[in-house]
């Protein structure tokens, strides 16, 4: 996992000096890994991760299975967050499940809820190389020849994620699909807008359309719920990791497909409907060949509309973190404008009579 420094400081334990924090972290790593001793060489913030904090953790392990210098990531909770996010222990568990299912993810290593180590819950994973910068991936001409193949591989990766099915004892903390399916999500959007001080009539209209077009139930699968460009790493043209699992849970398989294809995640390449990198065909082909399941365009269309509403609500929540909760982060402040972009997309996708161009 790569990135550049941000203005945040090292994770803090109140009343404990930075050097002592590194010592405490080193002791945890030694105990968790079975090493004789560990020296924390570097702990540097990484850009990206709008919901959580990521730190490049370089450490030297003396003895044990990890002997030598290791390049890791420490992932912990941001000062403020989004209510739908899993906690770090839960995210660690879903990352382990994805890793075991053969999904290309950073290998999860160790987790802790002990606030005495870095001040809040965290987990560690191997650091993978490359970039997740969406605008770079979608706009770099050097990548263009490889992007259809990357889209096809991403379709296969998504199908592997969807091989995880309920019930799972290791994922027992996930809410049942009946409590997180489209009906529940739509009700949550409406409740949020009812509390919001600013009227959003286009979102209300989109919500009403969703309420009257919910597709028939389907067998739930494990869904990433934020599978998109910007949440995977590329090292050149090589996919090195699917990232940011904090929203994952049980869902309709078409939900992840609709989210990936939503216009809000094309990053100025609106002509490339699959994540801003390719046409839908290679992405769908990869998914269908790996899963043995056909993609249903009508279901995808419903989930694209829901994705636009959901992204708009998340954008408003991110702005709340800046305006109300006081988290001074420019990215959070700027995210609010995305809500208006989502509203425009809803207007373009749904015709004035309340029907759908894709339904």
Which stretches of residues belong to each language-model region?
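ATP-binding pocket architecture of kinase catalytic cores
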Residues: 42-209, 213-219
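Activation of the activation-loop gatekeeper triad in protein kinase-fold domains
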Residues: 243-248
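Conserved protein kinase catalytic-loop anchor
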Residues: 220-222, 240
């Amino acid at each position: 996992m790569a990135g550049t420094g941000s203005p945040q400081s090292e994770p803090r334990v109140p009343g404990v000096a930075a050097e002592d924090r590194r010592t405490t972290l080193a002791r945890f790593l030694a105990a968790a890994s079975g090493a004789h001793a560990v020296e924390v060489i570097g702990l540097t913030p990484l850009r990206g991760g709008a919901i959580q904090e990521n730190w490049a953790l370089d450490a030297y392990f003396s003895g044990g299975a990890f002997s030598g210098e290791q390049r890791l990531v420490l992932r912990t909770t941001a000062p403020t967050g989004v209510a739908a996010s899993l906690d770090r222990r839960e995210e660690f568990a879903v990352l382990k499940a994805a890793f075991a299912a053969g999904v290309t993810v950073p290998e999860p290593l160790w987790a802790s809820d002990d606030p005495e180590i870095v001040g809040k819950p965290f987990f560690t994973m191997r650091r993978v190389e490359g970039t997740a910068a969406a605008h770079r991936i979608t706009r770099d001409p050097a990548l263009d020849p490889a992007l259809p193949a990357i889209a096809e591989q991403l379709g296969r990766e998504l199908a592997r994620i969807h091989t995880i099915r309920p019930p799972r004892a290791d994922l027992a903390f996930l809410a049942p699909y009946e409590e997180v399916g489209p009906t529940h999500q739509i009700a949550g959007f409406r409740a949020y807008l009812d509390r919001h001080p600013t009227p959003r009539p286009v979102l209300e209209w989109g919500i009403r359309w969703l309420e009257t077009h919910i597709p028939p139930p389907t067998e739930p699968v494990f869904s990433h719920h934020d599978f998109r460009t910007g949440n995977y790493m590329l090292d050149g043209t090589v996919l090195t990791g699917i990232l940011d699992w904090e929203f994952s849970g049980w869902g309709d398989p078409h939900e992840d497909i609709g989210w990936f294809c939503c216009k809000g995640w094309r990053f100025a390449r609106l002509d490339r409907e699959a994540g801003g990198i390719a046409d839908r065909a290679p992405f769908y082909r990869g998914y269908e060949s790996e899963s043995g399941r056909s993609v249903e365009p009508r279901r995808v269309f419903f989930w694209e509309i829901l994705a636009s509403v959901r992204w708009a609500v998340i954008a408003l929540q991110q702005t709340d973190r800046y305006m109300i909760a006081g988290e001074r982060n420019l990215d959070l402040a700027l995210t609010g404008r995305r809500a208006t972009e989502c509203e425009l997309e809803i207007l373009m996708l749904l015709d004035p009579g309340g029907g759908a161009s894709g339904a």
